[in-house]
Amino acid sequence: MSEFTVRGRFPARYGEQNFEKNVEAPNEDVAQERVYANFGSQHGLKRTQITIDEVDA
């Protein structure tokens, strides 16, 4: 598995909050899915509320 850096933003109390997460995944699509799942469980956000701008290997 490779390590991917996923950058994006999500709505916070006062505007948008930028984020950068490092995740291990076999490909970029799985890395995005893991970020969606992580933010959904930790912050209670829906997938449509999370904007992923960039995925780097």
From Swiss-Prot:
Q: Which GO terms describe its cellular component?
A: ribonucleoprotein complex; ribosome
One Gene Ontology biological process: translation
Where does the source fall among the domains of life? Archaea
According to the record's subunit comment, the protein's assembly and interactions are:
Part of the 50S ribosomal subunit. Binds 23S rRNA.
Name its species: Natronomonas pharaonis (strain ATCC 35678 / DSM 2160 / CIP 103997 / JCM 8858 / NBRC 14720 / NCIMB 2260 / Gabara)
State a single Gene Ontology molecular function. Answer: structural constituent of ribosome
Keywords per UniProt: Ribonucleoprotein, Ribosomal protein, RNA-binding, rRNA-binding
Q: What is this protein called?
A: Large ribosomal subunit protein eL20
Task: Tell me which NCBIfam families the record gives.
Answer: PRK00773.1-1
> Which family does the record claim for this protein?
Belongs to the eukaryotic ribosomal protein eL20 family.
The UniProt entry, under InterPro entries, shows:
Ribosomal_eL20, Ribosomal_eL20_dom
